Amino acid sequence: MDLRKKIRIIDDFPKKGISFKDVTPILKDPKSMKHTTKEITKYLEDKNIDVIVGPEARGFLFGILVAQELDLGFVPVRKPGKLPFKTFSVDYALEYGLDRLEIHSDSIEKGQNVAVVDDLLATGGTVLGVTKLVEKIGGNVSALSFVIELTNLNGRDKLKGYNVQSLVKYDDL
């Protein structure tokens, strides 16, 4: 299945010059959603994963599907102030400044193997923040999987030493 045909391109969103890659048509179509889940699952099957982590918000959508398929738990990583229990946090670099991510303090046990699932790898800032957060609380990041990768933004370069999968690659913004 060619997932590229299911990704909607929206020019000049969220700002002029950006060509937004919208994954919601994949989620709307059961066959595309199932195919995406299966492709990520196949990649992760031999990596001895204990838990799936997904960053807010679209990482939740794909991460939950993959976790369910692999019969694993799912852990959300959120922006500050969104999780009700004790959290660990990490600051991470954005193109212009810093942001923060949080995870529940009891969500990953020391030594657990973690796969991070998200919709998009762009500059790598968010996923690098997620990996630091997982490692900070004792997890091992065994794999990273993305539906889309924007190769011209070189996010993969920040992820050396990690197993990285992307299903669809674009070389434009």
Swiss-Prot record:
- Entry EC number(s): 2.4.2.7
Catalysis: reaction(s): AMP + diphosphate = 5-phospho-alpha-D-ribose 1-diphosphate + adenine
Listed GO biological process terms: adenine salvage; AMP salvage; purine ribonucleoside salvage
Tell me the enzyme class.
transferase
Task: Give the CDD domains listed for this entry.
Answer: PRTases_typeI (cd06223)
Q: Which family does it belong to?
A: Belongs to the purine/pyrimidine phosphoribosyltransferase family.
The protein's name:
Adenine phosphoribosyltransferase
Q: Which gene encodes it?
A: apt2
